[in-house]
């Protein structure tokens, strides 16, 4: 990031306007760190603006922030899942859980070890998830992988079934579904009713797993609206803020001072 900003500075010697998306629960120290990144190590005169990540997602999904009476967003990322409710132009409830794509990979590793006595790495688990991950019971596929035999310690090739992969994925999806249900129970009734009418917006890179929206719908009893932007939703929201002056209302600056 520093090298990219340094290159940009060579074309804009008077500084740039830099936008970051931040978690809702970011502390003052964490927010200050963004400014340090943008202006440290010989970088200078850059103005830093921040947009809360749920608001950026909402803008990307064309949710009318100022008039929304209650919209819920679920962003399933690599390491965590963020749950947020937006109403009257602000995030009123938000929390994150340590469950995402990487935890699914770990579960797949565990299932392969349990069913085949084979140790595989995170990259192999990720490839299996991408190739055979389906949150439905009709998926019947197989893939060959090479791993380390748990007993002999020697390399071994094995054919892995999609049911083994999906067992690991569904275990994590069950946790996410239970958290969403608990989250809705803590949401004010009138807002929860609006969310039930509108549906829950689903974004994030891990939302690419086929049938995840219907699976979570069965877990929670709510309908889900899957974003086709996936991992790009937050970036697309920032892009809209940069290009539209009216949307810059949702960005806030950091007080700048010499480091």
Predicted regions and their residues:
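Nucleotide/phosphate-binding catalytic cleft detector across ATP-hydrolyzing
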Residues: 1-73, 86-200, 207-234, 239-259
């Amino acid at each position: 990031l520093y090298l990219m900003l340094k290159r940009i500075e060579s074309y804009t010697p008077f500084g740039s306007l830099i936008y970051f998306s931040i978690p809702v629960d970011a502390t003052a120290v964490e927010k200050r760190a963004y400014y340090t990144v943008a202006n440290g190590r010989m970088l200078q005169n850059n103005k830093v603006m921040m947009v809360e990540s749920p608001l950026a997602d909402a803008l990307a999904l064309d949710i009318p922030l100022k008039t929304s009476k209650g919209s819920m967003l679920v962003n399933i990322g690599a390491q965590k899942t963020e749950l947020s409710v937006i109403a009257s132009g602000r995030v009123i409830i938000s929390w994150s859980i340590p469950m995402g794509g990487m935890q699914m990979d770990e579960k797949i590793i565990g299932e392969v070890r349990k069913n085949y006595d084979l140790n595989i790495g995170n990259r192999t688990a990720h490839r299996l998830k991408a190739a055979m991950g389906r949150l439905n019971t009709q998926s019947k596929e197989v893939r060959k992988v090479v791993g380390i035999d748990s007993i002999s310690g020697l390399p071994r090739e094995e054919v892995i079934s999609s049911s083994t992969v999906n067992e690991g994925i569904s275990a994590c999806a069950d946790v996410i579904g239970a958290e969403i249900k608990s989250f809705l129970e803590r949401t004010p009734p009138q807002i929860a009713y609006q969310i039930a009418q509108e549906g829950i917006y689903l974004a994030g890179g891990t939302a690419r797993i086929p049938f995840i929206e219907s699976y979570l719908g069965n877990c929670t009893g709510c309908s889900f609206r899957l974003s086709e932007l996936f991992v790009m939703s937050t970036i697309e929201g920032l892009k809209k803020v940069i290009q539209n002056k009216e949307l810059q209302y949702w960005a806030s600056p950091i007080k700048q001072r010499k480091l």
